[in-house]
Amino acid sequence: PRGSFKEEKIADFVCSFAENLGLEYTRDSANNVVVRKPATPGYEAHEVVMLQGHMDMIWNKRPDSTFDFEHEGIKLKVTDDGYLMAEETTCGSDDGVAVAYMLAILQDKSLKHPELECVFTTAEEPGLYGVQKFDCSQLKARKYVSMDGNLEGTSLLIAAGAANARFTKRFQREVLKDAAELAIQVHGLTGAHVQFQERQLANAIKTVVRIVYYIRKEVPCRLISLNGGSQTTIPVDCTARIALALEHMDKAREVAQRVLEEVKFEHKESDPNMTLSLSEKAHASPAMPEDVTDKVVTLLRLLPAGLVDTSLVFPGLPISSFSLETIETTDSSIGWFYRPTSAITSKMLDMDEQSRLLAQLFDVEYHVENYFYGHNVEAGTPLYNVFDQVWFEQNGEHIRPIGAHYGNEIGFFLRNMPWLDMILLVATHYQAHTPDEKLDIASFDRCYRCLVEILRRV
């Protein structure tokens, strides 16, 4: 399994694969690999084509699974209805499809095509970290086929960019004499990839913070910890631990239950299984100082999380959103991952600045780990038209242009190589990033045949 930031072995394999075929390749410090295949006779004068996808996959397994991603191989299976899945885990079709296509094309000497640059990138899933270290000056391509998506017969014209940001507040804990501890867990939320902000799902972190805020309006209490969420996912689970006097425990429980019922009613269609679990300890662990508790809770209350606006071109498509994805507490700090996101670069950068201003107001550190950029391209380019013609001839349908509220590496390459004529060609797969991830095998075959024919015609 090729987890993000753990791509060394798959990069070794790709390099060895290229070497055994006698193909030129390069590898950088982030384990991004480029393999070059010469043009077949008669195609030497054609423009160079880049094929591109990422090698890393999301590691996710069922709650009761003992699978060890570090040491076990993915256990694949084919279902009776024609899907490729894994036992108990993600199967890696995101973006294993691209890796498989490129390896097959590199190996097949019967194909006709221009010179190819097959680009295998890393650490895409947590925030496009690998490609940030990629040197585009080594590429000669004028045409670009991205293969990171999830629906055949479409091409992605609009995608979002984002700031991968982190808030951090440092502190020294204090021992509170005679304080008890209440753990407040909100779980059972629906959750989804953060691209689906139009569903207006509840956020477990925001819900728990709302509960703590209203408890503090009724009784004195301090934060001990806040932990929850998973990166690139609308949080489904979060737990706060607070320190308070034992005499205030019943009131805190009452407030927690009341606020949970309010949030559950507000999200009765989207999150019907939202659940509150409360547990007590007679003696509280050391807590954050009062001023830190106040700043953290208030800032988290004020930070927007969710949909900002939608497209007028693609009805229902989110254009901008704020994504609060994970929060974690150590002995001396609390931090959370936050992602101002927009398909419009200027708006994304302004949302980032808004977030920075809020952090400054509450004396909280705000650091952007990296920016990645969306893209906005037109249908009807020469490469798009070839794609549309081939797909129609093979499948009887025209390509459907779409937009999506997620970022991928297309924006990076178009920003650094603005002359590229780009299409997105992908096989259909479902439930990416979950143990139910499955690849439509028939779609995988259709899209590969289409890709091979596109290369023959360009």
Segments the model singles out, each with a brief description of its role:
Residues 312-315, 319-339, 390-391, 395-453:
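Zn-dependent metallopeptidase/amidohydrolase metal-coordination segment
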Residues 3-47, 402:
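A non-catalytic alpha/beta surface segment that caps or lines the substrate-entry region
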Residues 195-228, 365, 369-371, 375-420:
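Active-site-adjacent substrate-binding region
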Residues 75-89, 189-190, 392-397, 429-432:
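Glycine/charged-rich beta-loop-alpha catalytic/anionic-binding loops adjacent to active sites
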Residues 43-120, 124-126, 131-144, 151-152, ...:
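Active-site metal-coordination/substrate-binding segment of hydrolases
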Residues 44-45, 246-255, 345-350:
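Short, conserved charged micro-motifs
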Residues 74, 81-84, 125-126, 131-340:
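Midchain, well-structured core segments that form catalytic/ion-binding scaffolds
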Residues 199-218, 249, 292-301, 308-312, ...:
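His/Asp/Glu-rich mid-to-C-terminal helical/loop segments that flank catalytic regions of hydrolases
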